[in-house]
Amino acid sequence: MNPIGVVICNYNKKDFVLQCVQSVLESKEKNFDIYVVDNASSDGSAEALKKAYGNRITVIENKENLGGSGGFNTGLRIVRDKGYSYFMCLDDDAAVDENALSVLYHYMEEHTDTGMAGCRVYHTQMSDYIQQSGLLIDFDNCTAKTIGADMPEDGSLPDVIECDTVATCAVMVRADTVKQKGVGIMPEDNFIYWDDMEWGYRIKLAGYRVVTLAEAKALHQMGANTKKENTFINYYMWRNRTNFFMRFTPEAQMEAMSVKVMGAVFDAMYESMFREEHNVRQTISYAFYDALAGVRGKADSYKIMKNDANDNKLIQTLQGRKSFAIEENNQEEDAYYLRNFIASVCPDLREEEQTKAEIVFRFCDYIFYSEKMPDGKEILIDSERNCVVDENDIEICKNYGYSKWLFIYMNQGVFLAAARRMRGEIVDE
């Protein structure tokens, strides 16, 4: 029997998943079996896979879209029950180097204290740039930090990186770890997002090492940088992130965590209100209160709405102008993207010196944190392209601080009670 069961989860990415399977089959070492789980795709993925690869792979067809974690778990249950020593998880839009599986396998064979080993993942369209090489859970700021994100591959990162978790786009897991108390397979009730982070962190809490290996290389598409049609991502990211920190934050940091998480949720909703992105704001609100209520799994359909994210305020500010200037304030990259945006929407607008320009964009870290409001022809702008243009905007910014602490004050008791109620509920599959 081969020691590695490869599980690929696919949803409507026919062309990508065919490339993913092909990359695995081209691996130098052939000690694996491939299982592709199709999450009820409508693009003919399952038929294309069967036609292209026949009995070289096993295609499992779910009757409905079970999400990323549910799709992976369909395959993980099979490879677990068949007795494979290692599980290799791959996203449908990932592709592995010919040595990747071999490098991961031999490392884990030699390092029995390692429960999860991931590839160093590069951007498919910019293969010299790292997408991620593991993640660290930052309990002080209640977020996850991606190691090596978007940095050029210059050899400066260690060959073996110790981390808290690894994204399941290209990761190998020791089968014995899922038998440990509190680990199990992927947390299916996430549906999608933060499921892989929780799984890896569970493995680490069980006493295993979690690493990424530079010699195990993979490419990952990870979607185009375009506006999404609906608020799907907003809902699952916010609900599952909130749930994660409610469950896993060390007891001594619980109160600080509640302030950080609720502060981040408030910032996202207040910013959406300011930008008149009412559907985005409503979805984040649903996500937050669902996290407090312990709502898991697939969201009710009414909570996923048309994405109304926009740059209307900035575009309206630019219209009818003839010239602009930018005060960068050490935010050169943000200024670069602003120039590109202006060129795309108002190509005739010219950049001039501040004294001659009709409007001057002054960069700050975040408009709601800025102590200095704009005056005259100044427009305050931040990296998210939030901009303060008129007296009404200034008034909203002035109300931000009090509104934020009122939101935290009103919700903290309920938040902490909900967190303590759900802690300790991690169960084996």
Question: Where are the model-predicted features located?
Answer:
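A short, conserved alpha-helix in the catalytic core of glycosyltransferases
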Residues: D164-K217
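Short, acidic, metal-binding catalytic loop of nucleotide-sugar glycosyltransferases
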Residues: Q22-N31
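Short beta-strand-to-loop acidic/aromatic patch adjacent to the donor-nucleotide binding site
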Residues: Y84-A95
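Non-catalytic, C-terminal membrane-associated alpha-helical segments of glycosyltransferases
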Residues: Q253-K322, Y400-E429
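Active-site-adjacent helix/loop segment of glycosyltransferases
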Residues: I161, L205-L292
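Glycine-rich, basic loop-to-helix element that forms the pyrophosphate-binding segment
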Residues: N62-K82
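Conserved donor NDP-sugar-binding/catalytic core segment of glycosyltransferases
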Residues: E98-D138
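A conserved acidic beta->alpha catalytic loop
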Residues: S23, D38-E47, E64
